[in-house]
Amino acid sequence: EISLGLVGSEMCIRDRIKWPNDVIIDGKKICGILTEMSSEVQYVHYAVMGIGINANKEKFDETLKDKATSIYLSTGKKVNRAKLTAAFADAFGGYYRRYMQDGDLSAFVEEYDELLANKDKEVIIYHGMVEDATPDKISRGIARGIDKDGALLVEIDGSVTPVMSGEVSIRGVQGYV
């Protein structure tokens, strides 16, 4: 996501990260990242990542227009998708090499936190699926940043707790962000 943030900053886009896997502009989703992995304690069988970037979409239907945007809608300019992909791949490659060298995200925490849309804002944590939420599966807290493992650090009742993406869905108090 920081790679996308870097590409966005080069295009003069005011993008932010919605932990754990979305990039937003002005409160609307412009990019999503999906991952799937099969692993054991000491062995990864496979990892698959998919990235979708709304590049030149000119409009969204009624159900998405308040939640999604594109580079074109945000800048008024069409983007060359091949150049966008190349810029992202180049930025991602640098971040990935550093991650592999360090073995964790320590080198990126400060930069990520600067791009975090919900930093120092109240968030709602849904433990499980949002649509199945019951009061005992909902927590509220203040997003404080991420740790070296990529967990969102959420302050709940004065105590900071790391929250992993597989456990929750994060929503801002005002809605999606």
What do these predicted ranges mean?
Residues E1-I13:
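Single conserved hydrophobic/aromatic residue that forms the stacking wall/gate
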Residues E10, R14-Q42, G52:
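Acidic (Asp/Glu) carboxylate-rich active-site/surface patches
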Residues K29-G32, T134-R140, V160:
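Short, mixed charged/polar active-site loops
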Residues Q42-L73:
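Short, acidic (Asp/Glu-rich) active-site segment that either coordinates a divalent metal cofactor
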Residues S74-S139, R144, Q174-V177:
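Conserved, helical-rich catalytic subdomain that frames metal- and/or nucleotide-binding sites
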Residues L152-I156:
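SH3/SH3-like beta-barrel fold
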Residues S159-R171:
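A short macromolecule-binding patch
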